[in-house]
Amino acid sequence: MKLHTLLDLRGNIPTFVHVSHGKVHDVTVLDHLPIEPGAFYVMDRGYVDFARLHRFTTHSAFFVTRAKRNLDYTRRESRRVDKTTGLRSDQTIMLAGVKSSRLHPDPLRRVTYHDAGTDRRFVFLTNNFTIPALTVAGLYKSRWQVELFFKWIKQNLRIKAFFGTSENAVKTQVWIAISTYVLVAILKRELKVDRSLSAILQILSLTLFEKTPVIQALTSGKTPDSDGRNFNQMTLFDL
């Protein structure tokens, strides 16, 4: 089973989730993705399909992705870059492959960036020509928030093992976990709670059967003990 998620970085809240079988190719999820005009969609190169990427252009939306190593293209224009920022090139290109040029006939922007921290070179593709080249690299870096989202789900909502083996049982557990994440994220934002999502979830789980108002439980200044005991529980032996 695969879980494809569109994460809105303005609040780190999933706005689109598609559950598919493990054998389904990642790129097919783009057929189900609702495209919002003016929005940026950041994805890894497993989703590179030029016919599907061209849909973003026709819907007045933008994408940022990594180019595949065997990309066949011709350079139309090069712009100056400040190499002290890690940028190596900022080009306007046209796809040169017989099939790819037919599937995506419009120009693309190719940005090359060197990450000094990892000593790696990244080549990005986008259909946006107005934002700074460094912003293109920054947008792709923000894709890491999706990885953090899945890590949070696995660590805090216990999807390390499934309680059932049927398709319906697995999907139900996944949707419950995602719904819990969204509710906690909304709660944090609406109540302006200065705690991590993990801390909020832990407090809620420990005060689940109490009559304490949620806002009081989250802003009281008390935190669960490091061993996970309820901080409202009385001490059995007061020595």
Please provide the spans of the model-predicted regions.
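Single, function-defining residue in the core of a domain
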Residues: 1-239
